[in-house]
């Protein structure tokens, strides 16, 4: 079973895909309904805005503190993991991550890997690499399983199959799972998935999982999940490989508690998830279960680029709750696939440029009205709109003197836009010239073009008023003098 | 977001920063805002050299260009008077982004910070500084309110319009669905991503119209142009009006020469 490799996403592609979804009333309605549901679930968990504010401030502090000590914490994490019997690997990019995991699989002659939900494994295209090496990598999270069966990519970081309706899934299972007939009964559908997966857990050579929080002080990996498949993946097969980004580390176990509480409430509106796994090493002597061997792969993939800049570093505070997507009016209109990145929505717009470079992603920071809904709900207070503006600047300009260029720096620069904004600055920083312009624009308003690029696709043309406010005020002054 | 308001007596003088949109595209709203202030006994000063807050360049990532335009506004408000802005997003630009824009120039930063402190969105100023108390003089009507994202999330003024309208006995304010959602304008976003922007504007127009209100109100010129332009293209007669104009009309104008009532 394969998923398609990540699609390259040049600006025109994004625009085209977005326009396609927007023109589909069925999809529009379905996304809107799903997002409304998630928004309401989250809101119900936060009845007291002041308390929420205090919690967000604390969570932000913890994430900032952790990042401020990142190199030291990573060293401490590694030392403690090794002490606990976990092998630690460092991967600078997706190829390295895949090679490491493939190497471990080969050591064990592995044929089958069962996977818990891991966005970093999506980010490095692990399934694709495993498939190319002839190893079956099977998703065991229900949403991921559905997406994999369909040969697609997740469209949401928490709910990978949110773009699929019950009917889509019924059809998919009937087509792809041997011996299953069409049913729209959700419980029956879930049971189909369970039956398939249950057996695979027993047969798998390798269990792969993500990590929500890595605790430096104890060398523990925390895994948040609802289906129990994460626990199966990390305990049943003989080898457990965890994969995560280098930013996920916190110093102490107690730092996990406030983050966990906000993560589940922000993501699915749950006060707590059904499962919370704290994994501190492989099976020990005398223990009856657990993997005999355990690995952690720590992936950089552009994170150090974000880390190097004080402002952009805030991107790494993210705990991947998905609330920014759920509340994003753009994501709600176009869904996750239009972005063409592993992480869609607002978080995707600010993190993908570091992972894929600005040449492939420069359009994404611009795919926002800067309405601020994302920053308002982000549990770790990432100022997403400010970061979008910053990336818009980096995408259209050379690096500032003394600053290292980002990968793909300036790739979105166009002569048209540069000239337009130069013209804007020229006109609006010269009051006398602007007054002349305003005078002309109002007098010659009949010359206003009726086709105004994107604006008039769905709106009537913009036309200056017959008299500007300045004109009206000047007239009033004359009137006043006359009436004296 | 909620600010500390200046203590002390009611100001006698204010500056009015019209914004480029109001100056050229909805000057009537600017006039009505000025008259609302004047009726409270305030002298309104309109610096002739004002142009634009620089926001279009700033949000598009052209910080140098935004700085050039913003710099041209910094010296226009020398007296220590409040600066009233009839648009949430431009007020937000001056109040929150000017100090950041000049972060690396201590002299200009000090100026920008001083200005930022004095910037008020119109409804905020009317309600919180002037404590206006109005009597409604219009026929019963139903309206719905679109609060801009900047008013809501940058200025924290989204409830002020509601409170002002609550003073008007004949005005019923109807609740739209997805009230806090953006109308899809987003400055240059509306031309860079026309399909998404158009879909958002269209959904917003639907939500406002579905309330059954006679009209919708907004304190932001950009949102008004976006939603009204969408409705007009659909040949729908439902329209939005700037909050300032509505307030001026409902409260009877001043009876003076330039009152809306007289012009009509
Ligand atoms: S950016 Fe904030 S809201 Fe978005 S996924 Fe990350 S933590 Fe959640």
Question: Where is each model-derived feature located?
Answer:
Chain B
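Iron-sulfur cluster-binding electron-transfer modules in prokaryotic oxidoreductases
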Residues: 1-264
